[in-house]
Amino acid sequence: MRRILVTGAGGRIGNYLRERLPRPDRALRLLDVGPQAPPAPGEPVEVLRADLTDAGAVAAACAGVDAVVHLAALRGEDTWENILRVNVDGTRTLLEAARIAGVPRVVLASSIHAAGFYRRAGAAPEPSGVPAPAGPDGVPSGSVPRPDSYYGWSKAAAESLGSLYADRFGMTVFALRIGACTTTPAAWNRDAWLSPDDCARLVDVCLTTDATGFRVLWGVSRNRDRWWSLAEGAAIGYDPVDDAEAYTAGMTPMDDAHAPTVGLLGGTFCTLPLGKPR
Protein backbone atom coordinates (compact mmCIF):
# COMPACT_ATOMS: atom_id res chain seq x y z
CA MET A 1 0.00 0.00 0.00
CA ARG A 2 1.48 3.34 -1.06
CA ARG A 3 0.73 6.27 1.21
CA ILE A 4 0.51 9.77 -0.26
CA LEU A 5 0.61 12.91 1.88
CA VAL A 6 -1.56 15.72 0.52
CA THR A 7 -1.02 19.13 2.10
CA GLY A 8 -3.72 21.77 1.82
CA ALA A 9 -6.12 18.86 1.50
CA GLY A 10 -9.11 20.82 2.76
CA GLY A 11 -9.05 23.24 -0.18
CA ARG A 12 -10.90 22.95 -3.45
CA ILE A 13 -8.21 21.01 -5.33
CA GLY A 14 -7.48 18.92 -2.26
CA ASN A 15 -11.10 17.83 -2.12
CA TYR A 16 -11.11 17.03 -5.84
CA LEU A 17 -8.08 14.79 -5.31
CA ARG A 18 -9.53 13.20 -2.19
CA GLU A 19 -12.35 11.89 -4.35
CA ARG A 20 -10.19 10.82 -7.28
CA LEU A 21 -6.70 9.71 -6.17
CA PRO A 22 -7.42 6.75 -3.87
CA ARG A 23 -7.23 3.28 -5.39
CA PRO A 24 -6.78 -0.25 -4.03
CA ASP A 25 -3.01 0.12 -3.63
CA ARG A 26 -3.01 3.75 -2.48
CA ALA A 27 -4.10 5.56 0.67
CA LEU A 28 -4.05 9.30 1.38
CA ARG A 29 -2.83 11.18 4.43
CA LEU A 30 -4.66 14.52 4.34
CA LEU A 31 -3.09 17.52 6.07
CA ASP A 32 -4.70 20.95 6.42
CA VAL A 33 -4.58 23.89 8.80
CA GLY A 34 -8.37 23.89 8.96
CA PRO A 35 -11.01 21.25 9.69
CA GLN A 36 -11.72 18.48 7.20
CA ALA A 37 -14.51 15.98 6.84
CA PRO A 38 -13.73 12.79 8.77
CA PRO A 39 -13.08 9.64 6.77
CA ALA A 40 -16.19 7.95 5.44
CA PRO A 41 -16.60 4.24 6.22
CA GLY A 42 -14.06 2.36 4.13
CA GLU A 43 -12.45 5.54 2.76
CA PRO A 44 -8.66 4.99 2.59
CA VAL A 45 -7.70 8.33 4.10
CA GLU A 46 -6.15 9.65 7.29
CA VAL A 47 -7.01 13.21 8.35
CA LEU A 48 -4.47 15.44 10.12
CA ARG A 49 -4.75 19.06 11.25
CA ALA A 50 -1.58 21.15 11.45
CA ASP A 51 0.00 24.37 10.24
CA LEU A 52 2.48 24.00 7.40
CA THR A 53 4.91 26.26 9.24
CA ASP A 54 5.03 23.86 12.22
CA ALA A 55 8.18 21.92 11.37
CA GLY A 56 7.54 19.19 13.92
CA ALA A 57 4.01 18.53 12.70
CA VAL A 58 5.11 18.51 9.06
CA ALA A 59 7.93 16.08 9.88
CA ALA A 60 5.46 13.75 11.57
CA ALA A 61 3.12 13.98 8.58
CA CYS A 62 5.95 13.02 6.20
CA ALA A 63 6.97 9.96 8.18
CA GLY A 64 6.23 6.75 6.33
CA VAL A 65 4.83 8.25 3.13
CA ASP A 66 5.91 7.39 -0.41
CA ALA A 67 5.19 10.75 -2.02
CA VAL A 68 3.85 14.21 -1.23
CA VAL A 69 1.34 16.33 -3.14
CA HIS A 70 1.95 19.84 -1.83
CA LEU A 71 -1.09 22.07 -2.31
CA ALA A 72 -0.99 24.14 0.89
CA ALA A 73 -0.55 27.85 0.21
CA LEU A 74 -2.20 31.22 0.26
CA ARG A 75 -4.25 31.09 -2.92
CA GLY A 76 -3.91 34.68 -4.09
CA GLU A 77 -2.20 38.00 -3.48
CA ASP A 78 -1.44 38.79 0.14
CA THR A 79 0.99 40.78 2.23
CA TRP A 80 4.67 40.18 1.64
CA GLU A 81 5.07 38.82 5.17
CA ASN A 82 2.23 36.32 4.79
CA ILE A 83 3.41 35.23 1.35
CA LEU A 84 6.91 34.56 2.68
CA ARG A 85 5.70 32.74 5.79
CA VAL A 86 3.21 30.40 4.14
CA ASN A 87 4.11 29.98 0.48
CA VAL A 88 7.90 30.16 0.69
CA ASP A 89 8.90 29.16 4.22
CA GLY A 90 6.09 26.60 4.30
CA THR A 91 7.31 25.00 1.07
CA ARG A 92 10.88 24.89 2.34
CA THR A 93 9.68 23.29 5.59
CA LEU A 94 7.77 20.67 3.60
CA LEU A 95 10.66 19.85 1.26
CA GLU A 96 13.13 19.60 4.13
CA ALA A 97 10.81 17.32 6.10
CA ALA A 98 10.31 15.14 3.02
CA ARG A 99 14.06 14.94 2.46
CA ILE A 100 14.78 13.93 6.05
CA ALA A 101 12.01 11.33 5.93
CA GLY A 102 13.42 9.85 2.72
CA VAL A 103 10.36 10.71 0.63
CA PRO A 104 11.59 10.33 -2.96
CA ARG A 105 8.88 12.25 -4.84
CA VAL A 106 7.09 15.58 -4.38
CA VAL A 107 4.43 17.14 -6.58
CA LEU A 108 4.34 20.92 -6.00
CA ALA A 109 1.32 23.05 -6.88
CA SER A 110 2.75 26.05 -8.68
CA SER A 111 0.56 28.42 -10.69
CA ILE A 112 0.22 30.06 -14.08
CA HIS A 113 0.83 33.27 -12.14
CA ALA A 114 4.49 32.28 -11.84
CA ALA A 115 4.60 33.17 -15.54
CA GLY A 116 1.82 35.75 -15.65
CA PHE A 117 3.58 38.37 -17.76
CA TYR A 118 3.94 36.19 -20.82
CA ARG A 119 1.75 37.32 -23.69
CA ARG A 120 -0.55 35.35 -25.89
CA ALA A 121 0.86 34.73 -29.37
CA GLY A 122 -0.58 37.42 -31.63
CA ALA A 123 -1.24 39.85 -28.77
CA ALA A 124 0.12 43.39 -28.87
CA PRO A 125 3.93 43.37 -28.53
CA GLU A 126 5.55 44.17 -25.23
CA PRO A 127 7.24 47.55 -24.77
CA SER A 128 10.56 45.73 -24.78
CA GLY A 129 9.74 44.18 -28.13
CA VAL A 130 10.14 40.66 -26.75
CA PRO A 131 7.82 38.35 -28.69
CA ALA A 132 5.48 35.89 -27.06
CA PRO A 133 7.31 32.56 -26.65
CA ALA A 134 4.43 30.45 -27.87
CA GLY A 135 5.27 27.62 -30.22
CA PRO A 136 2.75 25.71 -32.32
CA ASP A 137 1.30 24.14 -29.17
CA GLY A 138 1.56 27.20 -26.91
CA VAL A 139 3.99 28.52 -24.29
CA PRO A 140 6.47 25.77 -23.32
CA SER A 141 6.26 24.66 -19.70
CA GLY A 142 9.97 25.25 -19.21
CA SER A 143 9.67 28.97 -19.89
CA VAL A 144 11.50 31.01 -17.26
CA PRO A 145 9.26 32.57 -14.60
CA ARG A 146 7.73 36.00 -15.20
CA PRO A 147 5.56 36.39 -12.09
CA ASP A 148 2.67 38.83 -12.05
CA SER A 149 2.36 39.40 -8.27
CA TYR A 150 3.90 38.54 -4.92
CA TYR A 151 1.74 35.42 -5.09
CA GLY A 152 3.13 34.51 -8.52
CA TRP A 153 6.67 35.22 -7.33
CA SER A 154 6.16 32.88 -4.37
CA LYS A 155 5.15 30.11 -6.75
CA ALA A 156 8.25 30.73 -8.84
CA ALA A 157 10.27 30.61 -5.60
CA ALA A 158 8.64 27.28 -4.73
CA GLU A 159 9.62 25.95 -8.16
CA SER A 160 13.20 27.05 -7.53
CA LEU A 161 13.22 25.31 -4.15
CA GLY A 162 11.93 22.17 -5.84
CA SER A 163 14.75 22.36 -8.38
CA LEU A 164 17.28 22.79 -5.57
CA TYR A 165 16.05 19.73 -3.68
CA ALA A 166 15.95 17.65 -6.87
CA ASP A 167 19.49 18.58 -7.89
CA ARG A 168 21.09 18.53 -4.46
CA PHE A 169 19.39 15.50 -2.93
CA GLY A 170 18.23 13.43 -5.89
CA MET A 171 14.53 13.87 -5.19
CA THR A 172 11.99 13.81 -8.02
CA VAL A 173 10.00 17.04 -8.02
CA PHE A 174 7.23 18.03 -10.42
CA ALA A 175 6.05 21.66 -10.30
CA LEU A 176 2.57 22.04 -11.79
CA ARG A 177 1.70 25.51 -13.06
CA ILE A 178 -2.00 25.09 -12.45
CA GLY A 179 -4.58 27.20 -14.24
CA ALA A 180 -8.17 27.58 -13.05
CA CYS A 181 -9.17 24.27 -11.47
CA THR A 182 -12.93 24.43 -11.07
CA THR A 183 -15.86 22.13 -11.72
CA THR A 184 -16.86 24.11 -14.82
CA PRO A 185 -15.07 26.93 -16.69
CA ALA A 186 -16.15 30.53 -17.07
CA ALA A 187 -15.60 32.88 -19.99
CA TRP A 188 -12.66 34.58 -18.31
CA ASN A 189 -10.75 31.37 -17.51
CA ARG A 190 -11.75 29.04 -20.34
CA ASP A 191 -8.23 29.03 -21.79
CA ALA A 192 -6.66 28.18 -18.40
CA TRP A 193 -9.27 25.73 -17.18
CA LEU A 194 -8.16 22.49 -15.53
CA SER A 195 -11.02 20.10 -14.92
CA PRO A 196 -11.03 18.15 -11.65
CA ASP A 197 -10.70 14.89 -13.58
CA ASP A 198 -7.74 16.16 -15.62
CA CYS A 199 -6.17 17.51 -12.43
CA ALA A 200 -6.32 14.02 -10.94
CA ARG A 201 -4.94 12.55 -14.18
CA LEU A 202 -1.97 14.93 -14.06
CA VAL A 203 -1.19 14.30 -10.40
CA ASP A 204 -1.59 10.55 -10.86
CA VAL A 205 0.89 10.58 -13.75
CA CYS A 206 3.38 12.52 -11.62
CA LEU A 207 3.01 9.92 -8.86
CA THR A 208 3.48 6.92 -11.15
CA THR A 209 5.79 7.93 -14.01
CA ASP A 210 9.33 6.62 -14.23
CA ALA A 211 10.53 10.16 -15.03
CA THR A 212 12.89 11.61 -12.45
CA GLY A 213 14.59 14.89 -11.63
CA PHE A 214 12.88 18.28 -11.70
CA ARG A 215 10.20 19.25 -14.22
CA VAL A 216 7.76 22.10 -14.68
CA LEU A 217 4.43 21.18 -16.28
CA TRP A 218 1.37 23.20 -17.20
CA GLY A 219 -1.74 22.19 -15.29
CA VAL A 220 -4.42 22.83 -17.89
CA SER A 221 -6.96 20.72 -19.74
CA ARG A 222 -7.07 20.14 -23.49
CA ASN A 223 -8.79 23.48 -24.07
CA ARG A 224 -9.10 24.63 -27.66
CA ASP A 225 -8.19 28.20 -26.61
CA ARG A 226 -5.28 27.33 -24.32
CA TRP A 227 -2.04 29.30 -24.48
CA TRP A 228 0.13 26.58 -23.00
CA SER A 229 1.94 23.59 -24.38
CA LEU A 230 0.86 20.10 -23.40
CA ALA A 231 3.94 18.52 -24.97
CA GLU A 232 5.99 18.32 -21.79
CA GLY A 233 3.13 16.68 -19.90
CA ALA A 234 2.57 14.26 -22.76
CA ALA A 235 6.21 13.20 -22.49
CA ILE A 236 5.49 11.65 -19.08
CA GLY A 237 2.02 10.35 -19.95
CA TYR A 238 -0.38 13.23 -19.17
CA ASP A 239 -3.27 12.95 -21.63
CA PRO A 240 -6.00 15.44 -20.66
CA VAL A 241 -9.50 14.73 -21.88
CA ASP A 242 -11.66 17.74 -21.07
CA ASP A 243 -12.11 20.94 -23.09
CA ALA A 244 -13.72 24.16 -21.87
CA GLU A 245 -15.29 24.49 -25.31
CA ALA A 246 -17.90 21.94 -24.25
CA TYR A 247 -19.28 24.53 -21.80
CA THR A 248 -19.40 27.50 -24.18
CA ALA A 249 -23.18 27.60 -24.34
CA GLY A 250 -23.44 28.21 -20.60
CA MET A 251 -20.86 30.99 -20.45
CA THR A 252 -21.53 34.70 -20.15
CA PRO A 253 -19.39 37.04 -22.27
CA MET A 254 -16.17 38.37 -20.75
CA ASP A 255 -16.77 41.77 -19.18
CA ASP A 256 -14.76 44.93 -19.85
CA ALA A 257 -12.92 44.65 -16.53
CA HIS A 258 -10.74 41.94 -18.05
CA ALA A 259 -10.04 43.77 -21.31
CA PRO A 260 -6.80 45.61 -20.33
CA THR A 261 -5.04 42.37 -19.43
CA VAL A 262 -6.66 39.95 -21.85
CA GLY A 263 -3.38 39.50 -23.72
CA LEU A 264 -1.45 38.51 -20.59
CA LEU A 265 -1.29 35.00 -19.18
CA GLY A 266 -1.84 36.29 -15.63
CA GLY A 267 -4.89 38.39 -16.52
CA THR A 268 -5.97 40.85 -13.85
CA PHE A 269 -3.24 39.67 -11.47
CA CYS A 270 -0.90 41.77 -13.63
CA THR A 271 -2.55 45.01 -12.50
CA LEU A 272 -3.75 44.30 -8.95
CA PRO A 273 -1.93 46.21 -6.18
CA LEU A 274 1.06 44.28 -4.87
CA GLY A 275 0.70 43.00 -1.33
CA LYS A 276 -3.01 43.74 -1.05
CA PRO A 277 -4.96 40.64 0.06
CA ARG A 278 -7.67 39.64 -2.38
What positions do the PLM features span?
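N-terminal Rossmann NAD(P)H-binding glycine-rich loop of SDR-like oxidoreductase domains
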Residues: 2-24
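NAD(P)H-binding glycine-rich loop region in Rossmannoid oxidoreductase-like domains
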Residues: 49-86
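Glycine-rich NAD(P)-binding loop of the Rossmann-fold in SDR/ketoreductase-type enzymes
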Residues: 53, 82-93, 101, 149, ...
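Conserved active-site helix of classical SDR/Rossmann-fold NAD(P)-dependent CH-OH oxidoreductases
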Residues: 91-92, 156-163, 167, 200-201
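Conserved Rossmann-fold NAD(P)-dependent oxidoreductase catalytic core, especially the SDR/UDP-sugar
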Residues: 93-145
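Alpha-helical substrate-binding/gating segment
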Residues: 167, 177-183, 193-214, 222
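Conserved C-terminal active-site "lid" loop/helix of NAD(P)H-dependent oxidoreductases
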Residues: 216, 222-239, 251-277
